[in-house]
Amino acid sequence: YGLVGSEMCIRDRYSDASVFTSTEGAQQVLIGAYDWFTNGHYAHYTNQYIFFMPDVMADDAMVNSTGNYNRFVSPYQYSITPSSTYSVDPWIGCYSLIDNCNAILDNLETLPESSERNRIEGESLALRTYAYHYLIRMYAKPVNKYPDNPGVILRLTSSTTDIPRSTVKDCYVQMVNDIEKACTLLTGTSSSSKCYITEQAAHGIAARIYLDLGDYTNGTSHANKALSEITLMS
Protein backbone atom coordinates (compact mmCIF):
# COMPACT_ATOMS: atom_id res chain seq x y z
CA TYR A 1 0.00 0.00 0.00
CA GLY A 2 3.01 2.27 0.44
CA LEU A 3 3.56 2.36 -3.31
CA VAL A 4 -0.06 3.20 -3.98
CA GLY A 5 0.07 5.97 -1.42
CA SER A 6 3.31 7.49 -2.68
CA GLU A 7 2.25 7.23 -6.31
CA MET A 8 -1.18 8.69 -5.60
CA CYS A 9 0.41 11.64 -3.80
CA ILE A 10 2.52 12.33 -6.86
CA ARG A 11 -0.48 12.08 -9.17
CA ASP A 12 -2.46 14.41 -6.93
CA ARG A 13 0.18 17.08 -7.46
CA TYR A 14 1.48 16.34 -10.95
CA SER A 15 0.19 14.90 -14.18
CA ASP A 16 1.80 11.76 -15.60
CA ALA A 17 3.33 13.92 -18.31
CA SER A 18 4.94 16.38 -15.91
CA VAL A 19 6.28 13.95 -13.31
CA PHE A 20 8.84 12.59 -15.77
CA THR A 21 10.21 15.94 -16.89
CA SER A 22 12.82 15.86 -14.13
CA THR A 23 15.00 13.25 -12.49
CA GLU A 24 13.49 14.29 -9.16
CA GLY A 25 10.03 13.26 -10.32
CA ALA A 26 11.29 9.96 -11.72
CA GLN A 27 13.14 9.32 -8.47
CA GLN A 28 9.86 9.58 -6.55
CA VAL A 29 8.31 6.90 -8.76
CA LEU A 30 11.41 4.76 -8.21
CA ILE A 31 11.04 5.16 -4.45
CA GLY A 32 7.46 3.96 -4.92
CA ALA A 33 8.84 0.78 -6.47
CA TYR A 34 11.14 0.22 -3.50
CA ASP A 35 8.15 0.70 -1.19
CA TRP A 36 6.79 -2.66 -2.32
CA PHE A 37 9.66 -4.26 -0.45
CA THR A 38 9.09 -2.47 2.82
CA ASN A 39 5.51 -1.34 3.37
CA GLY A 40 2.07 -2.82 3.30
CA HIS A 41 0.47 -6.25 3.14
CA TYR A 42 2.08 -7.43 -0.09
CA ALA A 43 5.57 -6.56 1.11
CA HIS A 44 5.48 -9.58 3.40
CA TYR A 45 5.14 -11.84 0.38
CA THR A 46 7.23 -9.94 -2.17
CA ASN A 47 10.26 -9.51 0.04
CA GLN A 48 10.24 -10.73 3.63
CA TYR A 49 8.45 -14.03 3.11
CA ILE A 50 10.19 -15.06 -0.11
CA PHE A 51 13.32 -15.83 1.86
CA PHE A 52 11.44 -18.05 4.30
CA MET A 53 9.02 -19.95 2.07
CA PRO A 54 11.67 -21.94 0.13
CA ASP A 55 13.40 -22.85 3.39
CA VAL A 56 10.28 -24.25 5.05
CA MET A 57 9.41 -26.15 1.86
CA ALA A 58 12.85 -27.75 1.88
CA ASP A 59 14.84 -29.27 4.74
CA ASP A 60 16.39 -26.01 5.91
CA ALA A 61 13.73 -24.89 8.40
CA MET A 62 10.71 -26.13 10.27
CA VAL A 63 7.53 -24.43 11.41
CA ASN A 64 7.08 -24.06 15.15
CA SER A 65 3.47 -24.72 16.07
CA THR A 66 3.72 -22.58 19.21
CA GLY A 67 3.03 -18.86 18.84
CA ASN A 68 3.34 -18.98 15.06
CA TYR A 69 -0.17 -17.71 14.25
CA ASN A 70 -0.41 -20.35 11.49
CA ARG A 71 2.22 -18.65 9.34
CA PHE A 72 4.01 -20.79 6.73
CA VAL A 73 1.97 -23.85 7.68
CA SER A 74 0.56 -24.40 4.18
CA PRO A 75 3.98 -24.06 2.46
CA TYR A 76 5.48 -26.35 5.10
CA GLN A 77 2.77 -28.96 4.48
CA TYR A 78 2.76 -28.46 0.71
CA SER A 79 -0.94 -27.61 0.92
CA ILE A 80 -0.89 -24.23 -0.85
CA THR A 81 -3.96 -23.71 -3.05
CA PRO A 82 -4.28 -21.43 -6.11
CA SER A 83 -6.30 -18.94 -4.05
CA SER A 84 -3.91 -18.93 -1.09
CA THR A 85 -2.22 -15.67 -0.15
CA TYR A 86 1.08 -17.49 -0.58
CA SER A 87 0.11 -18.06 -4.22
CA VAL A 88 -1.60 -14.78 -5.07
CA ASP A 89 0.16 -12.04 -3.13
CA PRO A 90 3.70 -12.52 -4.48
CA TRP A 91 2.28 -12.30 -8.02
CA ILE A 92 0.38 -9.10 -7.26
CA GLY A 93 3.25 -7.52 -5.37
CA CYS A 94 5.94 -8.32 -7.94
CA TYR A 95 3.88 -7.13 -10.90
CA SER A 96 2.98 -3.93 -9.06
CA LEU A 97 6.70 -3.31 -8.56
CA ILE A 98 7.31 -4.14 -12.24
CA ASP A 99 4.59 -1.67 -13.25
CA ASN A 100 6.38 1.16 -11.44
CA CYS A 101 9.67 0.25 -13.11
CA ASN A 102 7.99 0.12 -16.52
CA ALA A 103 6.49 3.57 -16.00
CA ILE A 104 10.00 4.94 -15.46
CA LEU A 105 11.57 3.04 -18.36
CA ASP A 106 8.76 4.12 -20.72
CA ASN A 107 9.46 7.78 -19.97
CA LEU A 108 13.25 7.88 -19.87
CA GLU A 109 13.50 9.89 -23.08
CA THR A 110 11.69 12.80 -21.41
CA LEU A 111 14.44 13.11 -18.82
CA PRO A 112 17.57 15.17 -19.48
CA GLU A 113 20.67 13.07 -20.15
CA SER A 114 22.79 12.79 -17.02
CA SER A 115 24.47 10.34 -14.70
CA GLU A 116 21.34 10.53 -12.55
CA ARG A 117 19.19 9.36 -15.45
CA ASN A 118 21.57 6.45 -16.00
CA ARG A 119 21.35 5.54 -12.32
CA ILE A 120 17.55 5.67 -12.32
CA GLU A 121 17.40 3.51 -15.45
CA GLY A 122 19.90 1.05 -13.99
CA GLU A 123 18.05 0.73 -10.69
CA SER A 124 14.71 0.31 -12.50
CA LEU A 125 16.10 -2.45 -14.72
CA ALA A 126 17.71 -4.21 -11.76
CA LEU A 127 14.55 -4.00 -9.66
CA ARG A 128 12.43 -5.34 -12.50
CA THR A 129 14.90 -8.17 -13.04
CA TYR A 130 14.87 -9.00 -9.32
CA ALA A 131 11.07 -9.24 -9.41
CA TYR A 132 11.06 -11.40 -12.53
CA HIS A 133 13.74 -13.67 -11.10
CA TYR A 134 11.58 -14.32 -8.07
CA LEU A 135 8.44 -14.84 -10.17
CA ILE A 136 10.09 -17.31 -12.54
CA ARG A 137 11.48 -19.36 -9.66
CA MET A 138 8.13 -19.48 -7.88
CA TYR A 139 5.71 -19.94 -10.78
CA ALA A 140 7.73 -21.89 -13.38
CA LYS A 141 9.95 -24.94 -13.69
CA PRO A 142 13.78 -24.86 -13.66
CA VAL A 143 15.33 -23.39 -16.79
CA ASN A 144 18.05 -26.03 -17.07
CA LYS A 145 15.48 -28.83 -17.37
CA TYR A 146 12.37 -27.21 -18.81
CA PRO A 147 13.48 -24.23 -20.95
CA ASP A 148 10.47 -24.42 -23.28
CA ASN A 149 7.84 -24.68 -20.56
CA PRO A 150 5.60 -21.70 -19.75
CA GLY A 151 7.41 -19.11 -17.70
CA VAL A 152 5.73 -15.88 -16.58
CA ILE A 153 4.24 -12.87 -18.33
CA LEU A 154 7.00 -10.56 -19.57
CA ARG A 155 5.32 -7.20 -19.21
CA LEU A 156 8.01 -4.76 -20.36
CA THR A 157 5.89 -1.62 -20.87
CA SER A 158 3.08 0.09 -19.02
CA SER A 159 0.56 -1.23 -21.54
CA THR A 160 -2.34 -3.15 -19.99
CA THR A 161 -2.86 -5.32 -23.08
CA ASP A 162 -3.23 -8.99 -22.19
CA ILE A 163 -0.21 -11.02 -23.26
CA PRO A 164 0.55 -14.73 -22.87
CA ARG A 165 3.25 -16.25 -20.70
CA SER A 166 6.69 -16.39 -22.26
CA THR A 167 8.79 -19.54 -22.14
CA VAL A 168 11.15 -20.05 -19.23
CA LYS A 169 14.10 -19.66 -21.61
CA ASP A 170 12.81 -16.36 -23.02
CA CYS A 171 12.30 -15.03 -19.50
CA TYR A 172 15.93 -15.75 -18.66
CA VAL A 173 17.12 -14.16 -21.91
CA GLN A 174 15.25 -10.98 -20.95
CA MET A 175 16.61 -11.04 -17.40
CA VAL A 176 20.19 -11.50 -18.59
CA ASN A 177 19.90 -8.63 -21.07
CA ASP A 178 18.33 -6.31 -18.50
CA ILE A 179 20.69 -7.05 -15.63
CA GLU A 180 23.78 -6.77 -17.83
CA LYS A 181 22.60 -3.34 -18.96
CA ALA A 182 21.84 -2.41 -15.36
CA CYS A 183 25.36 -3.40 -14.28
CA THR A 184 26.80 -1.13 -16.97
CA LEU A 185 24.55 1.81 -16.12
CA LEU A 186 25.28 1.49 -12.40
CA THR A 187 29.07 1.31 -12.79
CA GLY A 188 30.68 3.41 -10.10
CA THR A 189 27.47 4.04 -8.15
CA SER A 190 27.31 3.78 -4.39
CA SER A 191 24.84 4.62 -1.66
CA SER A 192 25.15 5.50 2.00
CA SER A 193 21.96 3.49 2.51
CA LYS A 194 21.75 -0.27 1.98
CA CYS A 195 18.16 0.15 0.81
CA TYR A 196 19.04 0.99 -2.80
CA ILE A 197 20.51 -1.06 -5.62
CA THR A 198 24.09 -0.16 -6.49
CA GLU A 199 26.63 -1.65 -8.87
CA GLN A 200 27.53 -4.44 -6.43
CA ALA A 201 23.88 -5.35 -5.80
CA ALA A 202 23.20 -5.56 -9.54
CA HIS A 203 26.16 -7.91 -9.95
CA GLY A 204 24.75 -10.03 -7.13
CA ILE A 205 21.42 -10.37 -8.96
CA ALA A 206 23.27 -11.25 -12.17
CA ALA A 207 25.30 -13.94 -10.39
CA ARG A 208 22.16 -15.69 -9.17
CA ILE A 209 20.62 -15.68 -12.65
CA TYR A 210 23.74 -17.12 -14.26
CA LEU A 211 23.93 -19.82 -11.59
CA ASP A 212 20.36 -20.86 -12.47
CA LEU A 213 21.49 -21.16 -16.08
CA GLY A 214 24.51 -23.26 -15.15
CA ASP A 215 26.81 -20.56 -16.54
CA TYR A 216 29.36 -20.74 -13.75
CA THR A 217 31.95 -18.62 -15.54
CA ASN A 218 29.70 -15.56 -15.71
CA GLY A 219 28.16 -16.42 -12.36
CA THR A 220 31.56 -16.43 -10.66
CA SER A 221 32.62 -13.24 -12.42
CA HIS A 222 29.53 -11.34 -11.27
CA ALA A 223 29.73 -12.80 -7.76
CA ASN A 224 33.32 -11.58 -7.41
CA LYS A 225 32.28 -8.11 -8.58
CA ALA A 226 29.39 -8.14 -6.11
CA LEU A 227 31.82 -8.85 -3.28
CA SER A 228 34.41 -6.30 -4.36
CA GLU A 229 34.94 -3.42 -1.96
CA ILE A 230 32.66 -5.08 0.57
CA THR A 231 34.11 -6.36 3.82
CA LEU A 232 32.76 -9.28 5.82
CA MET A 233 29.71 -8.29 7.90
CA SER A 234 29.58 -4.84 6.28
Question: What are the roles of these predicted feature ranges?
Answer:
Residues 138-169, 173:
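Short coil/linker segments at helix-helix boundaries
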Residues 125, 203-210, 222:
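TPR/Sel1-like alpha-solenoid repeat signature
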Residues 61, 72-73, 214-234:
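Hydrophobic-face positions in mid-chain alpha helices that act as interaction patches
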Residues 136-143, 190-191, 212-215:
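Short coil/turn linking the two alpha-helices of tandem helical-hairpin repeats
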Residues 30, 98-101, 172, 179, ...:
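Inward-facing hydrophobic residues that define packing positions of alpha-helical scaffold repeats
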